[in-house]
């Protein structure tokens, strides 16, 4: 094993030649490089595949004999300070390396076709290679300073890719928003690193953990200061992993190309925050207040992400809030001390979410042929529906990813999420109730997305919409090259809750406001429309492989053993595993508890799915005059109250909980107001004092000149009087 580990330093640098060669090619041979741009995908995929094979070898050796290998080079040494640069190989490193490389390979294969017509094809692949290099460098870092360097590189690459289509104002604003939000967390991370160096005198993980534990055990450190430093470290993870209250950048990050959305949400940027907390868990675990803070932030994010996903029109934004909620589950597990469950869910969620994003990219790709190249239209579920018969392979992939995220066995996320839900009962009943309730919400909003996208009929054909520029509803805008005209931004999916087929029924009224209903009655419309088409094989192949991962990756950590069979590979890989909730366990009791909790969690998920079907499954042909909500609550005061509550919830969710608005008012406008006040104080007060002294001197001089009548004798007399007064004042002050 030692022989393989000695060459582990090469892992981050294998993909690095690609952006260097692309840059040199564009500088030296720009025409040839652009003409042969598709050739760069192959070496990119090949080099990342080499890293994947190397990571698999490391993981196998970790399973056979778990150990930690660290190698460092002295970078700067003097009498006061020494810094070492190296790599750190353990089970967490091997897991993250496999995750980054496998998801990265599938995303690169997918991107070759998805980005083939984009002018920024070469730039995209250069950024992607640098992104993978940065993330691999992060997970192999051996100290906090090295982590911070690669942490910033990961952030830089994500900003470049979020703002990839920088000519579009929305993409540029999203890039700025991600940058500013993450600056807050990164500044906290840097302060926390410096604080712990001041306490322990070391940046190296093993030395840091050992010294800090001894200081805590001997009560030789100020506990409040330690808690503050640990909170600052955690702030970096909060921003990077889009945890409340620094989550606002993640939905807007969907302005980047869909493949990068898959990579960010599955294996790179948002995973970096979870990795940081997992890496520093031996540090956090001796500070109970920090563990409570981590679990509290996690459970708030779980619930907030799920509720904000309920009424999103944009398919990618809905998936983004789903990612936020699932990251909250991972953070909750880490805060509870359930290290294994958190990493297990990180793995299963990565493959499931990568599958969902690549499938959504296939959907967007097919919709662009009808509505044009504009995210406001091609990603809008208002225009979708009935895609099941047009993109069947994509539909199957999206359905499998949806079922996995809902926690339906035997798919990947079922095993990991159920373990977190089970552990939550041991930690806090209140947290458990919230976590289990959110599992039902997850099933509801995920199937809402699925039903609005794939079931029913293609809504774009019944919206009086045309993809031509003459349309009064939208104008085609090619990535910011043209002015956007009329956009109906207030169109919401709340009316889809009440499907009515009765042409004579009046619009529905809430609180004096008329809410229009979508009524589709004439399916015999003869006008020929263009229809979506299935994506090419190079886009479908990665989706099918990820589908297999989603089906079978849960087998690496089946949480119970049969006689003679040891199926829990993940626990072997994570030996010794940190778990504060299962220090003493019995296999039979654990198996019984697992089946009991699994039955309950699947029942909650099925209830969420059933509710989504009731509200969003179209009944166009079979029940022409059925208003579904009327089957449960007849029209009257109770029905009006129910509708007001539903509208209130959907309005709150649609507007992102008004959190972005609050930040805009309190922070953005507040800072602008402070800047204007500072400018006023500087110009009117500070400059006023300076200018006032000059003006006063001028008028005093003119007054003296006028009184003296231009006689030198008077000036001398006045001068002597002033000197005498000055001497008198000085005498009384000194003596």
UniProtKB/Swiss-Prot annotation:
Tagged with keyword Cytoplasm: no
InterPro entries cross-referenced by the UniProt entry: NADH_UbQ_OxRdtase_chlpt_su5_C (IPR002128), NADHpl_OxRdtase_5_subgr (IPR018393), ND/Mrp_TM (IPR001750), NU5C-like (IPR003945), Proton_antipo_N (IPR001516)
A GO CC annotation given for this chain: chloroplast thylakoid membrane
Enzymatic class: translocase
GO molecular function: NADH dehydrogenase (ubiquinone) activity; quinone binding
Keywords carried by this UniProt record: Chloroplast, Membrane, NAD, NADP, Plastid, Plastoquinone, Quinone, Thylakoid, Translocase, Transmembrane, Transmembrane helix, Transport
GO BP terms in the entry: ATP synthesis coupled electron transport; electron transport coupled proton transport
Transmembrane segments: 9-29, 40-60, 89-109, 125-145, 147-167, 184-204, 219-239, 258-278, 280-300, 327-347, 354-374, 396-416, 425-445, 540-560, 600-620, 714-734
Oligomeric and partner information: NDH is composed of at least 16 different subunits, 5 of which are encoded in the nucleus.
Annotated protein name in UniProt: NAD(P)H-quinone oxidoreductase subunit 5, chloroplastic
Species in which this protein is naturally found: Gossypium hirsutum (Upland cotton)
């Amino acid at each position: 094993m030692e022989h393989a580990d000695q060459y582990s330093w090469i892992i981050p640098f294998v993909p690095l030649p690609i952006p260097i060669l692309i840059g040199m090619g564009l500088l030296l041979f720009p025409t040839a490089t652009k003409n042969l741009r598709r050739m760069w995908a192959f070496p990119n995929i090949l080099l990342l595949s080499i890293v994947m094979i190397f990571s698999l070898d490391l993981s196998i050796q970790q399973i056979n004999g778990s150990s930690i290998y660290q190698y460092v080079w002295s970078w700067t040494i003097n009498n006061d300070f020494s810094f070492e640069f190296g790599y750190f190989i353990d089970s967490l490193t091997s897991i993250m390396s496999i995750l980054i490389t496998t998801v990265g390979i599938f995303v690169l294969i997918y991107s070759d076709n998805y980005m083939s017509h984009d002018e920024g094809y070469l730039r995209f692949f250069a950024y992607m290679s640098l992104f993978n290099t940065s993330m691999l460098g992060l997970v192999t870092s051996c100290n906090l300073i090295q982590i911070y360097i690669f942490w910033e590189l990961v952030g830089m690459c994500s900003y470049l890719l979020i703002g990839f289509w920088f000519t579009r104002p929305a993409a540029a604003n999203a890039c700025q928003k991600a940058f500013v939000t993450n600056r807050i967390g990164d500044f906290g991370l840097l302060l926390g690193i410096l604080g712990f160096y001041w306490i322990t005198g070391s940046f190296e993980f093993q030395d840091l953990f050992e010294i800090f534990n001894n200081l805590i055990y001997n009560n030789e450190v100020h506990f409040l200061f330690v808690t503050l430093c640990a909170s600052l470290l955690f702030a970096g993870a909060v921003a990077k992993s889009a945890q409340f209250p620094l989550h606002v950048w993640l939905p807007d990050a969907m302005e980047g190309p869909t493949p990068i959305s898959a990579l960010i949400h599955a294996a790179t940027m948002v995973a970096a925050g979870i990795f940081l907390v997992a890496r520093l868990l031996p540090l956090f675990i001796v500070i109970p207040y920090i563990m409570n803070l981590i679990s509290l932030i996690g459970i708030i994010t779980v619930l907030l992400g799920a509720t904000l996903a309920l009424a999103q029109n944009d398919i990618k934004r809905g998936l983004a809030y789903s990612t936020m909620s699932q990251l909250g589950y991972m953070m909750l597990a880490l805060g509870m001390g359930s290290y294994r469950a958190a990493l297990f869910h990180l793995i299963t969620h990565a493959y499931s979410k990568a599958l969902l994003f690549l499938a959504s990219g296939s959907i967007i790709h097919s919709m662009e042929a009808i509505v044009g190249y504009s995210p406001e239209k091609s990603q809008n579920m208002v225009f979708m529906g009935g895609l099941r018969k047009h993109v069947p392979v994509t539909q199957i992939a999206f359905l499998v990813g949806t079922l996995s995220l809902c926690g339906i066995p035997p798919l990947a996320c079922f095993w990991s999420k159920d373990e977190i839900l089970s552990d939550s009962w041991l930690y806090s009943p209140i947290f458990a109730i919230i976590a289990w309730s959110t599992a039902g919400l997850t099933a509801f909003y995920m199937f809402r997305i699925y039903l609005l996208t794939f079931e029913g009929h293609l809504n774009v054909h019944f919206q009086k919409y045309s993809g031509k520029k003459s349309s009064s509803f939208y104008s085609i805008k090619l990535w910011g090259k043209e002015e956007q005209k009329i956009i109906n931004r207030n169109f919401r999916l709340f009316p889809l809750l009440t499907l009515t087929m009765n042409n004579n029924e009046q619009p529905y009224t809430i609180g004096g406001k008329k809410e229009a209903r979508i009524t589709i009655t004439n399916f015999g419309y003869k006008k020929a429309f263009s229809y979506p088409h299935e994506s090419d094989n190079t886009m479908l192949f990665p989706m099918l492989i990820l589908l297999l991962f989603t089906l079978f990756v849960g087998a690496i950590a089946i949480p119970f053993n049969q006689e003679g069979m040891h199926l829990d590979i993940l626990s072997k890989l994570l030996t010794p595993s940190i778990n504060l909730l299962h220090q003493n366990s019995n296999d039979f009791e654990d198996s019984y508890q697992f089946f009991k909790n699994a039955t309950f969690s699947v029942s909650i998920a099925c209830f969420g799915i059933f509710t989504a079907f009731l509200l969003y499954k179209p009944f166009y042909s079979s029940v022409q005059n059925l208003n579904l909500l009327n089957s449960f609550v007849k029209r009257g005061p109770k029905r009006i109250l129910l509708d007001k509550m539903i509208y209130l919830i959907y309005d709150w969710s649609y507007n992102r909980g008004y959190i972005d608005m609050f930040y805009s008012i309190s922070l953005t406008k507040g800072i602008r107001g402070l800047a204007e006040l500072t400018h006023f104080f500087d110009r009117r007060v500070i400059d006023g004092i300076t200018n006032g002294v000059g003006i006063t001197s001028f008028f005093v001089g003119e007054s003296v000149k006028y009184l003296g009548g231009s006689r030198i004798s008077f000036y001398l007399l006045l001068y002597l009087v002033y000197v005498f007064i000055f001497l008198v004042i000085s005498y009384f002050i000194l003596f």
